[in-house]
Amino acid sequence: MTLAPPAARFGELTIHPDISRAIAELGFMAPTPVQTRAIPVLQAGRDLFAQAQTGTGKTAAFAIPILEKVDAVLKRPQALVVVPTRELALQVTREFGAIGKYRKSHEVAIYGGVPYGPQERALARGTQIVVGTPGRLLDHIEKGNLDLSGLFVVVLDEADRLLDMGFAPEVRRLLRRCPERRQTALFSATLVADVRDLAQRFSHDAVEVAIEPEKQNVDSIEQVYVEVLEQDKVRALEELLRRYETDQVLVFRHTKRGVDDLEEKLRKRKHNVAAIHGDMTQRERERTLERFREGDLHVLIATNVAARGLHIEDISHVVNYDLPEDAEVFTHRVGRTGRAGKTGVAVTFVGEWDFDQFDQLRAKAGVPFRREILELYDR
């Protein structure tokens, strides 16, 4: 298959007018590399195995071709997108809704931790696009609520995370339930052996696309470190919030208890702050994320796990309140800022016991850090 050269604008891709209108209203001007490469492959009906990092526009890369092919007259599932987390299910479903604004198809997010009833009713109405987590999808199949016999495409989004989280058996069961004659697309941040084996087993003559991580993840983020005693970290954070012109700030802590403790302290100091972690109900997390997404919150405090899949373009600053455990966690955290062509600042607190670990982290991360002196120590 001969691939077209990268498109400079969406107008250079062949996209249905209804979808072109929606993406123009969303402000999408130039397609990302993964969109340029993946959209023509999927439009041609080919299977796809794409290596692309989070934040590269991969959701639109598969949503656009799917929305073009879905038949809104047929009241049954035609496209299935399997994702590792509830937050990602909701995010992908929202993007389908936004891009498909002028199409007449319907999408539904299927995930655990909430009652079955609303999902059952949505499926009964004949939704065409189903986005969900493996366990709850299988539950609905077993209950007779979800029929996959009419699918023309299956997408495994963040396939490496699906396997890392132990969903391999459920994913295989789902794929065996799907029609043999179907299109299959896998998107993964890494080309680990397990993901490649899955792709080879359940796809046919797949086109392989590898997208290099965007340089903006490094170049557009200023890395700052601050030496601070553990007992002074709250005051240090307040000083940084005053010093920088911050839009929205994402603060990382290791533990749920640490998240709650910091939220309470900042709230008492009259900061517009909220927390998100795994002990909160799904509804509480969704409400908090929506407030942050809409700009109603200035500071969001989160654990690493709770912030996975968090994609908000206006996060101006990330603060590593607790030193990241390793370079991978560091990269994930700081990558929440400096997105969509914007610049960002990542501040890492280095406590009195953190110097050796920070030196190792800095060496592995391979990015320059600037030291900032706090006023509370510069007196």
Task: For every predicted segment, state its role.
Residues 2-379:
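Conserved helicase RecA-like core
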